Amino acid sequence: MDNEYLKTTGRIFDIQRFSVHDGPGIRTIVFLKGCALRCRWCCNPESQEFKIQNMVMNGKTKVVGRDVTVDEVMEEVLKDVPYYRRSGGGLTLSGGESLLQPDFAAALLRAAKENGLNTAIESTGFAPFENIQKLLPYLDLYLMDIKHTDSATHKAFTGQPNELIKANAKLIAENCGHLIIRTPVIPGFNDTPA
């Protein structure tokens, strides 16, 4: 078996163990750096820039972001295999936007699948479909955020239109085994009656 892919390098800003919200069962979430959207309400603003940053948090300067190999990430992920097996959990990639590091994301998902883990990605879908295709062979669940259906409103609040996101949602639905579309309800943005 060719294990060269385990040396693939990517940039992350966090690994969160024992999550139960982003896929089935108990999961480890790997947060990748970099996102093309600039959502005003972003819960992970430290994820938006791809570069490693010094940020002030709670009055202290903290380095946000680090370069890691797939092997290094999997060493952390595999610590909780008994919990995944018992709960049907596994690995979820989040961000930022994992699709902006497609080779690293695909290699992480491949490593998880080769270790018998359930895999998921939480994503905006704002990337070329070719990036998504790299992940599909190793993906059990695609959790897709669709923030607004109106492109002008979407652009006003995220910095980007949503045509690519909607086109990718259709393609993902046709090509991925399991797609769940989620919409964060944001007051003043998408919380009005239809």
Regions from the PLM with identified roles:
Residues 74, 78-194:
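Conserved AdoMet/S-adenosylmethionine-binding subsite of the radical SAM
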Residues 1-68, 79-85:
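N-terminal [4Fe-4S]-dependent radical SAM core
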